[in-house]
Structure formats: structure tokens, C-alpha cells
Amino acid sequence: RGLGDVYKRQPLLNYTVSGVIWYQGESNVSRRNEYKDLLTAMISDWRQRWNKSDMPFYIIELADFLSPTDKGGRTAWAEFRKAQAEVADTNKNVTLIKNSDLGEWNDIHPLDKKTLGQRVAAAILIEMNTKNRK
């Protein structure tokens, strides 16, 4: 954690946050072996700072990317997605939203935003409806 990170986040603490949609990771594929611990620590930190131990986190799965012939790169991206899935599986109220099927081999940003948006909305609505039934 750097001082810049604290500076950037500090103003957000004045806002009410109901949940977090986390869509990030392309630049961290090279650190995939430590990503699970880093993301878990961030989730814990944000929940503590907002005083919401059950604040939902929605992790957008890293989209598939790279040519099918780039075996090393594709393996690294698959390992990164596995780390994302493990964070969702081992932390309360964390949901992984599938995105790997929407990727483009030649564009790091999937073109199909509508399908992903519908998946995110559906996950949030399921969580809200479950919470309202309790």
C-alpha cells in the first residue's frame, strides 16, 4: 500500500457504499501468484474502513484474451482467473461474475458490454432479493 493509494481512497470514505463491482486485473497477471492474497486483503480493508463486514463484492472475471497459439500467456490468464475464483469461493459475500466467454483474442477489452452488464445486474438483484427475504 502506498501513500498515493490512501490519498485516492480517502475522499470516498465520506460516501455511502452498498457494494463494490471490481473490474480489474489485466495489469496484475504477472503477479497472479500473490493476487488472491492481495485482493482478499483489499476486500477486508475496504469492509473495515466502511464498517460493513458483509459489504458485497462482485469480481468481474478477467476476460479471455490472446491468440490461441500463445500457450504461455493463455495459461497465465487462466491461472489469474483461478485466483479470482478462489477469492470468491473463500470470502463471504463475494461473487465472481463470468466474463471469460466474452473476450476477444485481439482486444483486451471485450466488445460485448451489454451481456456483461446484464450479468452484473442479475448478480446484484439476486443478492438484494436474498437479503430482503431475511
Please state what every model-predicted region is.
Residues 2-7:
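Short, small-residue-biased leader/transition segments that mark boundaries at the very start
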Residues 82-98, 103-134:
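Catalytic cores of secreted or luminal carbohydrate-active enzymes
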Residues 15-19, 52-58, 89-96:
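Loop/turn elements at helix/coil->beta-strand transitions in domains of secreted/extracellular proteins
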Residues 22-27, 46, 60-64, 98-102:
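Active-site-proximal beta-strand/loop segments in catalytic clefts of secreted hydrolases
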Residues 34-41, 45, 75, 79-83, ...:
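Extracytoplasmic/secreted proteins, especially bacterial periplasmic and envelope-associated proteins
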Residues 23-36, 68-73:
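The substrate-binding groove and active-site-proximal loops of carbohydrate-active enzymes
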